[in-house]
């Protein structure tokens, strides 16, 4: 167990550092692209892959340079009881103790962008890191001042003990209910019977 925890922490730190390097490189490249674009006629993003990739890079760069910060506190990992045998859910961990940090911004449409890193205890009570980029389309319900609701996606990379901590790409949906600086945010991980089909959620505080 001591070896597993040491290895997990080492690999988690490596994943977080390398991801930060990737984000920084992407942000730097995108900033150069933005400088070039500003000296020419503004481009319009169509449906072609190069424009989408350039738009993604620009969003990463703007988020990386944003002065705003977020903290994440994982609160629940719920295994869908309709897709699991009871003997499995009885022994699975559903309290994902952990912590995370991110940088965020709201764009001109009030949509949320974030670059984040989080580590928590998975269903088998093993350390699991995750890093990625998140986007949510935000909606303000009626005249409820301070409240926001959002739905979107995250493009992330995780690593798990049962897969020997090999980095795994993990695109997932995102949702949130927010009031002022506090949010309840989560994702649903799809899967098959006795695998996946997990609701994972956390509290998010911005400053």
Curated annotation (Swiss-Prot):
The keyword Membrane applies. The active site is at 79, 122, 123. The record marks 88 as: Role in lipopolysaccharide recognition. Pfam families: PagP (PF07017). The record marks 193 as: Role in the phospholipid gating. HAMAP family: PagP_transferase. Homodimer. Transfers a fatty acid residue from the sn-1 position of a phospholipid to the N-linked hydroxyfatty acid chain on the proximal unit of lipid A or its precursors. This is Lipid A acyltransferase PagP.
